[in-house]
Amino acid sequence: MWEQNRHNSGSASQNEDDEFKKYIREIRDWPKPGVTFRDITPLLRKGNILSKAIHTMAYRFQNEGIALIASVEARGFILGAAMAHELQCGFVPVRKEGKLPYERLTMDYKLEYGMGTLEMHVDAIDKGQRVLIVDDVLATGGTAKATADLVKASGGNVVCAAFLVELTGLNGRNVLDCPVYSLVRY
């Protein structure tokens, strides 16, 4: 089972990590000099690898009583909706400001250069529901923390935050006050 301590590694085995890393492209100096971007699109286009990644991630949570998965647009939707299907639970879209038509909860969060706002419908989560946060990459943790704060503001319980990729040097898991699982770590 995955490690529940937020400061310790909840991640795939080294063999699984290496298998998935083969399909994550490294792009140096993008979006700016000195940054190495981890591009998951090669993994997304390999159906069998994408399926295995989703199954491997979802397997960790099959006995956790997950009622909902909350994911942030855009790549988070890809993984979160697929995991919700695998776990047979509901899916909650967390959107950037101004994208949802109904009454919303909003949460501001810090970006590398400025601020951002995430939103979720006010009726998306019932009080006490067990929610798994899913996104593509954990970097600084700002987006995941804002998502967790939205879940808590709605009365939901954050079970864990799960990511396809974790950039460990940015210490994003230290920002979160919930367990963290990552399939691949750099």
Model-derived features with residue positions:
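Active-site-facing substrate-recognition patch
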Residues: 2-66
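Short Gly/Thr/Asp-enriched flexible loops that form oxyanion-binding sites at enzyme active sites
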Residues: 78-89, 148
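Conserved acidic residues
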Residues: 66-67, 129, 159
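Residue-level signature of catalytic and energy-coupling elements of molecular machines
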Residues: 34, 69, 91, 161
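PRPP-dependent phosphoribosyltransferase catalytic core
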Residues: 2-16, 22, 145-186
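Short, glycine/charge-rich flexible loops or terminal/linker lids adjacent to PRPP-binding catalytic cores
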Residues: 89-131
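Conserved G/P- and acidic residue-centered "switch" motifs that form tight phosphate/ATP-binding loops
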Residues: 136, 141
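Short glycine-rich phosphate-binding loop at a beta-alpha junction
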Residues: 65-73
